[in-house]
């Protein structure tokens, strides 16, 4: 089954939205509308099968007490709370997993069997539960026949002691793949009456559920060292670099990412309200280095050579990302699949880059070396992309503007 996806530019999308809003505003007037100018577009909202609701009450009864207890203790988003809910659902015969793929799926063999029947073009059905960290779960009712997979997606949210269905929609999966890395990935455009009333359209969904188990130590290493960095507006895990040669690692992106961790507040150096004006800040040497130096074994001189440093007034020039440097807000994540303890006290983590948005459980693999510190902190030592003919490009990333590009766009503004 081929992936059919409508891609659109994030920036162009903003322009389209603005244009539609202008039309909406300009359409308001004292003159009565002319009936013969009104046209109607009808989209067939797929009916939600009644049998998809049959086991919902049973599922709610299984886990409602756990949600009530977690809410009372203000632990509804706690990992161990989610684990207990997933395991409880599994004990009652349901394949279940968490929405961040941090907990082993229960009853994975049922999902594997269903995937095999999809490949064999046999008829089958299954319910899979995805427990959210926002206080609820998504119930996927899947039905396959002739190699096609129909999805009924229902979201249930816990609130004030009750679990209520917020929205239900359905679609036929346009992309379906049970990957060699143990992920079930599927996507499509789903419709619901509630959504259509608000948007007059459907919503794209890209689902990635880890079916095969993963060692808990690997998950802990991911949560401790890789997930806090991630891939949003930085290239730490995209380019090759090490302590002897930091290469193309962008320390301004690192400053953006690490500033809130060090100062426990949002970064104050923001873009100008006028999108046509490029903001420029001079950050005191100590303030800038306090963010970077704890996370890298790098001296001031080397850091200055990788940035724009003003020796006269001892400041780092800093230009926040502007409109031309925004990214579409869909990102992959790194998942540790192995590690080595090195003789010098460092750890070498081997990880796959998983990108649900494009249905790829291994965009590429990379090795990250980290140095755990006695104070509980960490220094990042290196990153290396593992060469492979199957490696894909990092389509989610927008690099910062070069000095030349910045001048061409903003000039002396």
Named regions from a protein language model:
Residues 33-413:
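Mature, Sec-exported extracytoplasmic domains of Gram-positive
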Residues 29-31:
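Bacterial signal peptide processing site
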Residues 2-14:
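Bacterial N-terminal signal peptides that target proteins for export
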Residues 24-27:
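C-terminal motif of bacterial Sec signal peptides marking the signal peptidase cleavage site
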Residues 14-21:
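Sec-dependent N-terminal signal peptides
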Residues 1-3, 21, 108:
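Intrinsically disordered, low-complexity regions enriched in Ser/Pro/Gly/Gln/His and often acidic
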